[in-house]
Structures are given as C-alpha cells and as structure tokens.
Amino acid sequence: MRWRWRHGAERYEDARVTSNPPLGTRTLGRAGLRVATLGLGCMGMSQGYGAADRDESIATVHRALDLGVTFLDTSDVYGDGHNEELVGEAIAGRRGEVQLATKFSLSRGDAGMVLDGRPENVRACAEASLRRLRVDVIDLYYQHRVDPRVPIEDTVGAMAELVQQGKVRFLGLSEASAASIRRAVAVHPIAALQSEWSLWTRDLEMAGGGAAGEDTVLGVAREHGIGIVPFSPLGRGFLTGAITTPDDFAADDFRRGHPRFTGDAFAANLRLVDAVRGMAEEKGCTPGQLALAWVLAQGDDVVPIPGTKRRAYLEENVGAAALELSAEDLARLAAIAPPGAAEGGRYADAAYAYGDSPERGAR
C-alpha cells in the first residue's frame, strides 16, 4: 500500500481507519466518574503548537461532541485563561453532554512558571475557572503539578471542600509521584491521575517514574482505584509520522526547543516512528491511530486525551477506537518501543514531573 500526504505534509491520507462506531464510556476512579473512552485535549487551541484558528477550534469541540468525544480537558494556565474561556463558549448550550476537566496550581510569572498549591489559591482558582468556563460545577478538578512547598494534604483538603460545596464533582492529580498519590488519597478519593503516557513515554510504568527503589506510579494509582488519563498519547504529534524535520514546526511551536525534537535525539526518535509506521501499514491504519490504539489497550481504566485544534485530526484520532490489537500486536509494539526507548528528556528541568511536597510540619 502506498502512502500519500495531505497538503502541508501533516497527516497520512490513505490507509486511515475512518469508521467511527459509538465510543462508549470508561470509569475513572472507584467513585464512578463515567467519561467517554477517548477525550479531547484543548491546550493547543490556545498555546504551544503555533497559531490556532478560533472558529476551527470551536468547530472541533462541536465535532468532538457529535462523535461522542465528550471528555474535554483544559487548564487555567493554557493561554492564561483563554483556553477555559474558549471551551466555555464552545460548550454553551451543550453542557449536559460534557464531562469537563480543568486544572489549577500553575501560572506564569516574570521568572517562569510558578506553582501554588496553597488552600487559598485552590479556592480562588476554582472560582475563576467556573466563571471562565460559564458553568456551575467542574466535573474533574486536577492539581496541575504538585507544589514542593505546600503539603499535598493541605492542597487536597481545600479541593475536597470544593466537592462538599458542590463546585467540583471529582478530584484528580497530574504528574504526581507515587508518594504524593498515597498521601492525597488519605485525605480524599482521587478519581484520576493525568500523566504523559505513550509508546515513547513509558515512565509511568517505571519505578518512581524512572527513579530506582520506588514503586511505579501506575501501580500505586491502580492500587488505589485511580483512573489514568494519558496526555500526549501521540508523543506531542511525533508518533503520527507527520514530523520529519524540526523545520516542520512553526516559529512559535514549543517543540522547537523540546529535548526530543532537537539534535541527535530527533534523528534517533525518527527511527522509532519508522518502525511504528511499518506496522501501521500492515494494519491498514495511520501511525498515529496505531499509537493511540496501544494506549487504549493498556486497560479499561485508561482514557487518553489526544489534543488537536482541527476537525480532520480529531476524526483520525477517533478512528483509533475501532482498531483491535491482538496480543501479538501489543508484543510487537512493546519490542519497538520499550520503556526508555525514546532519546532525550520528556521535559525541561523545571517542569515538575512526578512531583513531591513537604511533609506537614517540615521546615
């Protein structure tokens, strides 16, 4: 089978799974948050991946709801609030169809990103998000990153008060360590853990997210009945096979400075994608669909949230739900992309992956 590129060399056009059967739902957490099997990450509609067309972004959200992709993910830091406003506008009149997730604790300061998990900030951020989203309740409220200065018990305690007040339905953590998860669930049930997980980022499966002598973050989350919400399940677009050179990125695309998209790491990671591409051709799907199907196959407690700001890419992603991977397929993919296979760090040093907080009373 021959592959043909769309204009702009962005996605494969042939051999794409295009049937879109009903997505169904999955459950996050023991408390029973039912969400669509596949979510939509909305960040790129406001930042990170070059310019976005507002009308196309809103149309993408509407198309997502039409296709049953009703689990929408945003954050107060995306576009400094713009993303929440955009999502709020897009879901106006369709709120009943949506499972809405947003996050707090990250903001931009003069010297870079600022973390704030203080209880008073939890409350202030929630009120601001409710206003921007134009809703009365947030279905899933995450701490975006663990604040290393504030005991997580204090942060989650303030989040739990929002549940008691009816402003939030379920609580989540993002990029938290195994130890932080254990401390958080002692305060209030956690429905979901959001973390990067894909064929080229399998740190979640590694001890301590990569540190020796610790439990896996994935194992601890599952021990406590916490659902997994993988972000960047397509490797920030790399696993679609569309990116062949750093010049494919717009000038304001953050991937230009990402460790895995620069220098020797870029060339090494292209070889991984080439192997995925070859298998996808055999399966009659795109590389991105195969990569996304692998994430979906990791368990019924897994709900990936691939991001896009275009309807065409959304529809391609939804097609991944129609793919069935055999045990042999999964074994082949595991051999192609074992944990640690990708070259380069997944974050810059200041990104607070798998964060910890101080013990209460510590100085």
How would you describe each model-predicted region?
Residues 52-64, 117-133, 177-182:
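Short, acidic/polar
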Residues 40-42, 74, 140-143, 173, ...:
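Conserved beta-strand positions
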